[in-house]
């Protein structure tokens, strides 16, 4: 019988998406096949402290904060030098804990922006999802669009602002440029529609800019696209494949954080999408092309707008898509014939395969000094 792989699922973090991360991690832990894997959870609290939860059933039954308070979550630190045992106890015994592969499910800042991926690279650990560079590019929405547009991928137009930029007259210039007074002001590097605000007047625009700068040091403005919100899941490394598309039908004014996570009737999500075969194939091909363009690996969800005249526009790429029981990434793959347990198996296999390929690369180049 093959030895079980030890999978560490990372969640929490110092991010506005902390709670969503925990929901995603719970669904993954609940879905992973315990006959194949030894499962532990690494929880990062709001101030950045790390904890090990090695009883997955406790994690499923209680909040991580509750487990920390009662002592079931052990405080740990990062231990370099032994990739097989990267977690070290802070309880005084110095015990080290193993991991064969890490499944990062820390959404947003410090989890999806390359910071966590860089740490896992330094630990020489296989991990699920995009590498440092791809994570950083996709987290910065304006950089994502710059790269995609340069590669010929159609994107929603945008304008970027920093706190140093003067905002006087910007709204009118953008209105003239796009021919609409309806705009979105959003943080460049946040997800889940955090700090994303619709505006229709210059007064609302000025207020929104001030509000978004409370969350990020750069923001982007986009014209509001009156079209269908379509998503497509991508899976793979060198030869990625795309799922059947899904659709978000918001019941709020737009697909806000509240509509996504707080209001059970905030939106309808469906994997039975009424699109022509040609548009469906176009979405799938653009999703794969975008995935390759930013050198993603493992997984990503590509979000689109489809206009009334069937123009397909990429909105953003999410390298750690939600994995809650209502999240679209696993649902789209299930609709495409790949159930979530098998999807998780493939993601872990892809992570280990990529790590093994990386280990074959020459990292040190010895040059003999020429004698003088």
Curated annotation (Swiss-Prot):
Enzyme Commission number(s): 6.3.2.4
ATP-grasp domain ranges (all copies): 145-349
Broad class of the protein's primary localization: cytoplasm
Residues bound to Mg(2+) 1: 303, 316
Gene3D superfamilies membership: 3.40.50.20, ATP-grasp fold, A domain, ATP-grasp fold, B domain
Keywords: ATP-binding, Cell shape, Cell wall biogenesis/degradation, Cytoplasm, Ligase, Magnesium, Manganese, Metal-binding, Nucleotide-binding, Peptidoglycan synthesis
Signal peptide bounds: none
Listed GO MF terms: ATP binding; D-alanine-D-alanine ligase activity; metal ion binding
Biological process annotations from GO: cell wall organization; peptidoglycan biosynthetic process; regulation of cell shape
Cofactor(s) the record lists: Mg(2+); Mn(2+)
Translocase among keywords: no
UniProt cofactor note: Binds 2 magnesium or manganese ions per subunit.
UniProt key word Magnesium: yes
Reactions listed under catalytic activity: 2 D-alanine + ATP = D-alanyl-D-alanine + ADP + phosphate + H(+)
TM region(s), chain numbering: none
Pathway: Cell wall biogenesis; peptidoglycan biosynthesis
Binding locations of ATP: 176-231
Localization in the cell: Cytoplasm
Residues that hold Mg(2+) 2 according to the record: 316, 318
A GO CC term assigned to this protein in UniProt: cytosol
Family that this chain belongs to: Belongs to the D-alanine--D-alanine ligase family.
Function, as annotated: Cell wall formation.
Name of this protein: D-alanine--D-alanine ligase
Record organism: Coxiella burnetii (strain RSA 493 / Nine Mile phase I)
Lineage: Bacteria, Pseudomonadati, Pseudomonadota, Gammaproteobacteria, Legionellales
Gene this protein is translated from: ddl
């Amino acid at each position: 019988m093959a030895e079980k792989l030890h999978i560490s699922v990372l969640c929490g973090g110092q991010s506005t998406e902390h709670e969503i991360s925990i929901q995603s991690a719970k669904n993954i832990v609940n879905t992973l096949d315990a006959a194949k894997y030894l499962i532990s959870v690494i929880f990062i609290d709001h101030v950045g402290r790390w904890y090990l939860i090695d009883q997955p059933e406790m994690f499923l039954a209680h909040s991580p904060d509750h487990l920390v308070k009662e002592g079931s979550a052990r405080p740990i630190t990062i231990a370099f030098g032994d990739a097989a045992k990267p977690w070290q106890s802070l309880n005084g015994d110095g015990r080290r804990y193993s991991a064969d592969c890490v499944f990062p499910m820390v959404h947003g800042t410090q989890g999806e922006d390359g910071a966590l991926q860089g740490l896992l690279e330094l630990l020489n650990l296989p991990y699920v999802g995009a590498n440092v560079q791809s994570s950083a590019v996709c987290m910065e929405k304006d950089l994502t669009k710059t790269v995609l547009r340069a590669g010929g991928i159609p994107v929603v137009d945008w304008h970027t602002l920093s706190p140093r930029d003067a905002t006087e007259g910007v709204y009118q210039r953008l209105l003239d440029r796009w021919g609409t007074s309806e705009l979105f002001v959003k943080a460049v590097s946040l997800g889940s529609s955090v700090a994303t605000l619709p505006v229709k007047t210059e007064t609302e625009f000025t207020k929104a800019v001030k509000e978004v700068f409370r969350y990020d040091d750069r923001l982007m403005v986009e014209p509001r696209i009156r079209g269908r919100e379509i998503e497509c899941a991508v899976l793979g490394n060198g030869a990625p494949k795309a799922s059947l598309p899904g659709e978000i039908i918001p019941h709020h004014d737009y697909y806000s954080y509240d509509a996504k996570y707080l209001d059970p009737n905030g939106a309808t999500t469906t994997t039975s999408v009424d699109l022509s075969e040609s548009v469906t194939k176009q979405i799938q091909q653009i999703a794969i092309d975008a995935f390759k363009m930013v050198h993603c690996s493992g997984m990503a969800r590509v979000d689109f707008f489809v206009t009334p005249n069937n123009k397909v526009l990429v909105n953003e790429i999410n390298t750690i898509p939600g994995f809650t029981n209502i999240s679209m990434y696993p649902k789209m793959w299930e609709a495409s014939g790949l159930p979530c347990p098998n999807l998780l198996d493939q993601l872990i296999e892809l992570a280990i395969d990529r790590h093994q390929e990386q280990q074959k690369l020459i990292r040190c180049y010895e040059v003999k000094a020429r004698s003088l």
